[in-house]
Every structure is written in structure tokens, then in C-alpha cells.
């Protein structure tokens, strides 16, 4: 899989750009703030409908513009598709496949797959549980694009159920409120079970790739492992050696419904939903010790990189090889990690890299350079490709 063409209009610092790309390695070169990372962010957005840098879409729209547009021609196994997304201020985003509108933007998911490694990835190890849940869910969705709808439905039901818990808790828990809560419990459990089943399957499948990737990056370190942690699931589901089963979602739905009923009194008292995948955690371990809070800076970098390399290997083992995005990371890595990452990049179908100077990129990658610069007055500078 590779991106043959990329177009941006009013996206971040780019007023307009049309790029022709090829397989192999391309490096966008430029000083910090020139907009090179915005190009990778745009490619990643088309793959995930989200940014690795911000949680909302508004910052992606160029200052002074009402909307931004991102599009790409994606080639996979000889077949080319065009995908476009329009990000709008104050209204719903819109998407097209081959210039034809689709009902929901998430219908483009799966056409382009990417794996991105960026300095922000240190938060996968050192950050809050939400960072690791997002990592799980984005990778699950890359493997099963229809899961995007399940995630959206779960988030919607969670918001509505949480609002009802607050209302019912304040108003003496009327029979009508409690009856409505029963209905929302059923919806929540159904969506949650599908999401948790896919997370468990992913952790099981990713584990051997993660262990091998970390071993190659830090052979002298303790072995790395991942596990799924949940307060409401029986231990049998959390055993990393347990193979996922096709009927897991049905069994999980019954468990979650039972746990919701048991937790209802506490939930009404506190006005929050205490059961569900929004409270679960991806556990990262080095030997018998949690990586968060105990791993050194070097170990944390190795674990973050191993998670991304494992994701890349897992995706290409089961579907089309994803586009590898490397955002200003070679300068952050020591020799061993640079060598390991360069080996993967050298073998990938398409790699898009950002760097401040050519020397930051290993020479053996022989990357095609594209220089990026900015022009204009302070506060209104726009990015452009340097030609000639």
C-alpha cells in the first residue's frame, strides 16, 4: 500500500499543496515550525480520522479559514482509490470516495492504513491510561474498520447513560428513570462487549510481535510484555495465553450487564459509569515491573518504539502493508534504536519521514528529499515546497 498523491487545502500551515509521491522512502526536510509534520499528520488523519497531536479537529483548520480539505490517492494491490475529507468549522465533516460523497466520514477507514512513530509516543508508556486505550482502539479499528461505528455508538451511549445517572441520582431515583437506565444498560453492554472482545484479541495477537521488537531494541533489558487490565472481567479473560473465541462478545455482554447491575447503587451515588472499556487499561510490563513509573528514559523509548514496530508487523502479516510515518524520531534515538528502525524502514513499501537536516536520517535509507519552508508575516505564515 502507498500514497501516490497527497493534496491539502487550508490544513494547518498549508494554504494549498499538491504532492506526487512514490514507493520507497521520502523525507520532508525543514526547520521546526515549517510545516513538515503537518504533512504526516494529514496522511495519518486520512487513515484514522484523528490527529496524533490534538484531540479536536478545529486546530487542523488554517487560521482564518472556514474549512480544511485533505485528500489522497491510495494504491493497494494495483487498485487505486481517491479519498477526501472536508473538515468544517461548526458543522459535520464530510468525506468522499472516488469523488462520490459517503454518508459517514468513517466509511473511508480501512482504505489507507498507517503506522506513525512520533516523539509524542513516549506518552504511550508514561502517559495516562487514555493514551493506551486510544492506541488499542485505533489499532483495533485498523484491523476491523467497522469497529469505528461501535466506538462511536459506545461513546454516545456512555454520555447519555452518564447524564441519566446524574439526573436519577438527584431526583430520588424514580421508577421511570430506573426503567430507562435498564434500557441504556443493555445498549452499553452490547457495544462494550464487542469493543472489549476486539481489544482482548488484539492484545493476544500483538504480544509476540511486541516481545520480539523490544528484544531487538534492548536485548540486555528485562523482557517486555503487555496485558489487558479490567476490574470487572473474570481472570480467565485476562490471561494473555488464552486464545480468543468467536463467542467472546456474547459472554462478555452477559458479564458486563451483571456488573452494571451490581454497580448501580454506587453509580447513582457518584453520577458516573463505573463499568466498561472506558475504565480499562493496557498494561505494559518489563519483567515483573510496570513500565509506567519504573522504566528508565531509554527503556520507555524502546517500549514505545516496540509498540509501533509490533503494530506494523502485525498489520502487514494479516492485511496490506501500512504506510510507515516517522515524525522527527531518528534524532531522538540512540544508535541501536536508529539501526533497528532503519531496518524496518528499508523493507517497507512506503515510508514518509520528517527531519530537520539530512544528517538526521540514516544514510542507508537513501530517502528522496523534499524541502519545506514558510513564507509570510508573523502570525500568517504559510508552508510551501521549495523547488529548484
Curated annotation (Swiss-Prot):
Gene3D superfamilies documented for this protein: P-loop containing nucleotide triphosphate hydrolases (3.40.50.300), RecF/RecN/SMC, N-terminal domain (1.20.1050.90)
Major localisation: cytoplasm
Localization terms from the record: Cytoplasm
GO terms for biological process, alphabetical: DNA replication; DNA synthesis involved in DNA repair; double-strand break repair; SOS response
Superkingdom in the source lineage: Bacteria
Residues annotated for ATP binding in this entry: 30-37
One Pfam family linked to the record: SMC_N
GO molecular function: ATP binding; single-stranded DNA binding
Keyword annotations of the record: ATP-binding, Cytoplasm, DNA damage, DNA repair, DNA replication, DNA-binding, Nucleotide-binding, SOS response
Listed GO CC annotations: cytoplasm
InterPro entries found in the cross-reference section: DNA-binding_RecF, DNA-binding_RecF_CS, P-loop_NTPase, RecF/RecN/SMC_N, RecF_2
Annotated HAMAP family: RecF
Free-text function comment from the UniProt entry: The RecF protein is involved in DNA metabolism; it is required for DNA replication and normal SOS inducibility. RecF binds preferentially to single-stranded, linear DNA. It also seems to bind ATP.
Family: Belongs to the RecF family.
Name this protein carries in UniProt: DNA replication and repair protein RecF
Lineage, opening ranks: Bacteria, Bacillati, Actinomycetota, Actinomycetes, Mycobacteriales
Underlying gene: recF
